[in-house]
């Protein structure tokens, strides 16, 4: 029978000092021997997805205490990728994922906590906490802050619901007046919560449901809706319940590595492919799998992408649907249910709330014919339509669900947008270890695209060339030296893609990079090219004017230059680490240099390699 980890500091004469300190935090003699549940919060006033989380730790703590545990809250950092976008602040975004993972590990292990509740939400926070949870392998429940509501369109400019990406792309549209742009800016992000499309934050929070580590509705229940409160309370109760099962009954099925098995990772990636999630999820899922010691790699993702169809197109892949519409259509259980009916789901995996995925979907998939009344009511939660930074501030409901499997937000396998899914992996002579593209954001006529290489060596240079209108129809912008090591930090390229879209080149050009893309990216954008240029990857050999071929259907990304010429170029570069040909105006701190010295390319999840 496993002993409470916290017993290390709460039992024995030699721990009198530690107990004295515990007492100073509010614990009493009656608390020693109860499971200590660490609550990893990520409240910050910098990030709309986290601005409402200040009191959420106390809410979870109340449920922990009521269930017989002892709650101890701490905080992690949280970077807003949108605010950090387009300048050197983005160098810190991906590295912050590892800082978050380490900080959770440090706090939990230093204080010998028995279980963990992760209160996450935005882009790097959920992945960082996920990596930590799988590294620690103690009972854990995830609960995120929830998605933002989408914004009202602007008459005469955009008739559809708007979000952050609309504000970015329309900023370079010369037909949009300053007054109209100001109105779009006002409307784009109306409430607290993670940005309203199927961007990275919402994608990752949805994937925690499929992994089995969060509760039904975690990925889609709006931050503003009162229904979200029950998720926080239930997370606290479940954490104590799991802790008691493990420490009192020796039930290892509640541990995160018992839940997030290879089959669970396959489910999560199948969901991601079906819903056309952010390409960043590939990076984070690969990193999480390594922490879980699960053999799951790009080849597995490639195989899944050939089997799993695209069942949903949510912003930025569509102007019709946002996360609130996914919720109305039944949320993640509905997408998983469609995969289940298509024979594309592992039903026997465990979750933190149900014995199996199959049992969970029986109750929560509103399209199954077996769903409970509580589940049906839960998925009627609607936006409030009022600007606010307050959680649980409204209780609006839709009149009915969207269960249109042919033309609604979530389609059936029979009515899929495409036979193959919304994400896929490309290989070729400039991506020997792979590259990732979000096909859900591309018109099928662009699945085969050949163009001229327009080579730049930084995101800043790409933005300058695009806004200077030097990039023309038929060009493929190649941004090298922006990978995990070369950036360092593997910047997101939302501004270049948004500007191409705003200038009317979104369907006439392509962009490829060893960097990555925001979850808000759509269009012919290929990222995560591995190996990266700074690691000697052939993307660093591409020259201006080279012909590049993109063949999505055959999973090919190549430069049409013969092997002998590529070998000559490689020899010319020499054996020293490759760097941009001209200096970049970029201050790289010691912290970033330390990150660059340890980080791997994207095909490995951009994890750090540390010698044992």
UniProtKB/Swiss-Prot annotation:
Keywords, comma-separated and alphabetical: 2Fe-2S, Amino-acid biosynthesis, Branched-chain amino acid biosynthesis, Iron, Iron-sulfur, Lyase, Magnesium, Metal-binding
PROSITE patterns: ILVD_EDD_1, ILVD_EDD_2
Cofactor requirement: [2Fe-2S] cluster; Mg(2+)
GO annotation terms (biological process): isoleucine biosynthetic process; L-valine biosynthetic process
N6-carboxylysine: residues carrying this PTM: 124
Active-site residues, record numbering mapped to chain: 518
Entry GO CC: cytosol
Binding-site residues, [2Fe-2S] cluster: 122, 195
EC number: 4.2.1.9
Known catalytic reactions: (2R)-2,3-dihydroxy-3-methylbutanoate = 3-methyl-2-oxobutanoate + H2O; (2R,3R)-2,3-dihydroxy-3-methylpentanoate = (S)-3-methyl-2-oxopentanoate + H2O
Sequence positions that bind Mg(2+): 81, 123-124, 492
Pathway where it operates: Amino-acid biosynthesis; L-isoleucine biosynthesis; L-isoleucine from 2-oxobutanoate: step 3/4; Amino-acid biosynthesis; L-valine biosynthesis; L-valine from pyruvate: step 3/4
Domain of life: Bacteria
Molecular function GO terms recorded: 2 iron, 2 sulfur cluster binding; dihydroxy-acid dehydratase activity; magnesium ion binding
UniProt cofactor note: Binds 1 [2Fe-2S] cluster per subunit. This cluster acts as a Lewis acid cofactor.
Enzyme class: lyase
Assembly, per entry: Homodimer.
Family in the record: Belongs to the IlvD/Edd family.
Main function: Functions in the biosynthesis of branched-chain amino acids. Catalyzes the dehydration of (2R,3R)-2,3-dihydroxy-3-methylpentanoate (2,3-dihydroxy-3-methylvalerate) into 2-oxo-3-methylpentanoate (2-oxo-3-methylvalerate) and of (2R)-2,3-dihydroxy-3-methylbutanoate (2,3-dihydroxyisovalerate) into 2-oxo-3-methylbutanoate (2-oxoisovalerate), the penultimate precursor to L-isoleucine and L-valine, respectively.
Full protein name: Dihydroxy-acid dehydratase
Species: Kocuria rhizophila (strain ATCC 9341 / DSM 348 / NBRC 103217 / DC2201)
